Amino acid sequence: MDTGVVPEKKSRVSSDRRKEKSRDAARCRRGKESEVFYELAQELPLPHSVTSNLDKASIMRLAISYLHMRNLLSTDNEEEQEEREMDSQLNGSYLKAIEGFLMVLSEDGDMIYLSENVNKCLGLAQIDLTGLSVFEYTHPCDHEELREMLVHRTGTSKKSKEPNTERSFFLRMKCTLTNRGRTVNVKSATWKVLHCSDHVRVHESPAEQIPGGHKEPSVPYLVLVCDPIPHPSNIEAPLDTKTFLSRHTLDMKFTYCDERITELMGYDPEDLLNRSVYEYYHALDSDHLMKTHHNLFAKGQVSTGQYRMLAKRGGFVWVETQATVIYNNKNSQPQCVVCVNYVLSGIEEEKMMLSLEQTEDMRPVKKELEEEESSEPEVSPVLLKEEKSPELDVIKLFTRAVETQPLSSLYDRLKEEPEALTLLAPAAGDTIISLDFSSPDSDILQKEVPLYKDVMLPSTSDKLALPLSLLPPSDQHLVPNTSVDTTEVSTGPDSSSTPGSHSFTEPDSPLDFCFPMESDINAEFKLDMVETLFAINPEPKTPFTLQAMEDLDLEMLAPYIPMDDDFQLRTLSPEEPLSCGPAQPLECSSLCSSVRLTQEVHSYPGSPFNAPGSLTASPALAASPALAAPEPADSPCPASLLTKTVPQMDREISLRSLASQNAQRKRKMSLSQAVGIGGLLQDHPGPGKKLKVSELSHADAPFNRTILLLPTDLASRLLGISSEGSGSPFTLPQLTRYDCEVNAPVGGRQLLLQGEELLSALDQVN
C-alpha cells in the first residue's frame, strides 16, 4: 500500500516554500532598511562622497551625534537662529584661527562632534571618531580626570549660586601621525598631549512638560578646544622677537636662556643661570604654575596659560610658556625641560618692586642720592640773610663758609653763592676788592691737620709742603733722569716779621714728601716711599685740639696701624730742640735769600751721603774732628736758620724729605755706587750694638763709612733731633738688641726677614 509516501513529499515542498518566502521577506526588509539608512545618510550634514561609503552602524552613530548637536544648538529664540551674513563669512575662518580642533563631548563621554582639522592634529578621520567614546582614544591614566570634567555639578550651596562651567586640563590622545607626516595603524599610535579648554554648556528642556507632570532634566555637554603642544624640535615657524627659549633642569633651574630676554625683561642670560624659575614668578601665580609643572612631569608637555613674570628693574610682563620634557633616547629617562616663552605684553607697573631681586638695582641709586644729599654743604642762617641783601661782602662770605665747611672747595662755595661771582669779577671802573689772607681764620685753617689718610692714596692736601734739596751738581752723572735744579726754601714777608708764625704746615701723608721727578720713576718712587719711609708722625693728628709735643704721653696714644705691611710698632719719645751754636740775628737780605737744606762738608767725590749732618753718614766722620770739616764760627747753621722761621715739626719734615730723596737715589743706583766705598766690617761702640759696615773699595779713601740698614719703622727716630754731646746736629738712633737681632741683615738683602718669617721671629722674642 502506497498511502504513507505521498504526505512526506508534500511536507518537504511546503517547508521549502516557507524558507524561500522568509528569505524573500528578509531580503525585502534589508532592502527597506538600506533605503532608510540611505535616506538617513542623505540627511546628515556630510558630503555625498562620505555618506555613500558609510555602513549602517556609522550612519546610526553619526545620526545620533547629529541629533545631539541639534539639541545642543537649538534655542527658542528664532531671531538668533537666523544666520547673519557676517556669521556665514566667519564660519570658514574659525577653524583656521584655532591651532587645534573643536570637540564636543556628551555626558557619557561620546564624541558627538569633532571638527575637520582633527585629521591634521591626530591623523584620525572625523567620521571615524564621531559618535565613539572618547575613552577608547585617551590614555588610561587620564580617564579619571576626564570623568571629573564631564560631571556638571549644580550649585546647591548658598555661596555658589552659579556653578563653575569653565574647564582646562591636559589630555593624552592617540596620534597616528609620525614626525615625518606619515600615518600609521591605530595599534601603533603614540600619545599626544592636548590642552583642552573651554566650558560646559547645558541644554535646558523646552517649556512644555511631559503629560506626567515631570520636567525633562537638563543635558550637559562639554565643549572643548583641543590645542596640541608642539615639540620644540618640530617648530616650523621662526620665533618672533617677543619669544625666547630657555632650558631648565628637572627642578626648574635655568641652564640656558635666550639673549632676547634682555630686551624683553631686562635680565642678562648669565644672571639667570642656576637660578630657580620660581624666583621670577609673580606670587599670585605660583600655585597655578606649580600645578602646571606637576602636569608637565606627569604627561610630558604642558602649556602654562597667561601668567606674570617679574621684570628686572621692577614690574612684570605677561607671559605664556609651552614646556616640553626631553627624554633620553637610550633609557627613556627625563633629562631636561625646554620652554618656549611667549611675551604677551610690555613691562607693567615698572615702579612696583615685587621681589628682592628687583631692589638690587635700586640700591646704588639710593646710595648715590644719599651721598649727594650728605655732600651738599649746609649754609648757616647768617649766610641766608646775606643772600637776601642786595650787596654781599665777599670776604665775610668766604670766612663764614670756612667756619661751617672747613674742607669745602672754592668751587662748592661759589656754587652755593652764585651772586658772589658778580663781585669777584668787577666791571670796568669798579674798585677791586683785595682779599685779606691774614685773618685769624686762615691761620687756624693752616694749623689744623687732618687725620691720617691711607698711605696707598695720593695726598689731597692743599697745604704747603717744604721744598726739597735735590742732588748736588757733582752727582748728576749718577742719576741722569733726576732733575738737577736745586730747590730752595724762601721765607715770605710774614715769616720775617713774625719769627714765631707758622709759614709751613705738615703734609697729610708720607707721599707729600715726594719731589718733582721724571715720569718713569714717579710710580716706582711712590711705592718705595710707602715701603721704606712710612713712620708714625710724632705730632698728634687731630683736627680739634693742638698740643705741644712735650705735653703728650705718647706711650698712651694708639699708633697708626697699616693694614697691608708688616711694620714693627713702637712708641716715639719727644725730641729735644735743635741746638747748633748760638743763634744769630737774621738780616733782611738773608731772610729774603734761599737757605740750602744740605751742606757738602769734606765730601767724597760722587757721594751724596757724605755731609756730617747726613742721615747715612759714617759715625766716624761725625765723631772725629779730624775728618770733619771745620765750620766757621760766625756762619749760622742751616738748622738754626730753620729754628728762627719754622717750628720744630717743620724741621723734621725737611729732614724726612731729604731721606726720601736719598732713598730714591739708592733705589735707582747700586749701593756701592751711591756710597762710593767697599764693604768693611766695623763694630759700633756700645754694648749690644751690631751694625752693618761697608768697606772702602778705593785705595785712597780717607775714612770708613757705616751704612745703617734699618726697618722702615725707625725712619722717624732716624729723623729725630738731639744735641747730646755730638759734634753733629744729628745723631744716630740708639738701637736695641731686639732691633739688631730681628732686623739686621746677615748675608745680604735677600736674607732679610720678610712677611710671615718676620712675624714668627717677633713672636719668639716676645
From Swiss-Prot:
Residues in PAC domain copies: 304-347
Post-translation changes: In normoxia, is hydroxylated on Pro-426 and Pro-559. The hydroxylated prolines promote interaction with VHL, initiating rapid ubiquitination and subsequent proteasomal degradation. Under hypoxia, proline hydroxylation is impaired and ubiquitination is attenuated, resulting in stabilization. In normoxia, is hydroxylated on Asn-743, thus abrogating interaction with CREBBP and EP300 and preventing transcriptional activation.
GO cellular component terms attached to this protein's record: cytoplasm; nuclear speck; nucleus
Subcellular location: Cytoplasm; Nucleus; Nucleus speckle
Positions carrying (3S)-3-hydroxyasparagine: N743
One GO-annotated biological process of the protein: intracellular glucose homeostasis
Biased composition (Basic and acidic residues): 7-26
Composition skew (Polar residues), residue ranges: 479-489
Domain bHLH: 17-70
Alphabetical list of Pfam families matching this protein: bHLH_HIF1A (PF23171), HIF-1 (PF11413), HIF-1a_CTAD (PF08778), PAS_3 (PF08447), PAS_9 (PF13426)
SMART domains: HLH, PAC, PAS
Notes on how activity is controlled: Induced by reactive oxygen species (ROS).
Domain PAS: 82-159, 230-300
Biased composition (Low complexity): 490-503
Region of interest (Disordered), ranges: 1-26, 361-383, 475-509
Record key words, sorted: Activator, Cytoplasm, DNA-binding, Hydroxylation, Nucleus, Repeat, Transcription, Transcription regulation, Ubl conjugation
Recorded domain comment: Contains two independent C-terminal transactivation domains, NTAD and CTAD, which function synergistically. Their transcriptional activity is repressed by an intervening inhibitory domain (ID).
PANTHER family in the record: HYPOXIA-INDUCIBLE FACTOR 1 ALPHA, HYPOXIA-INDUCIBLE FACTOR 1-ALPHA
Subunit: Efficient DNA binding requires heterodimerization of an alpha and a beta/ARNT subunit.
Protein name: Hypoxia-inducible factor 1-alpha
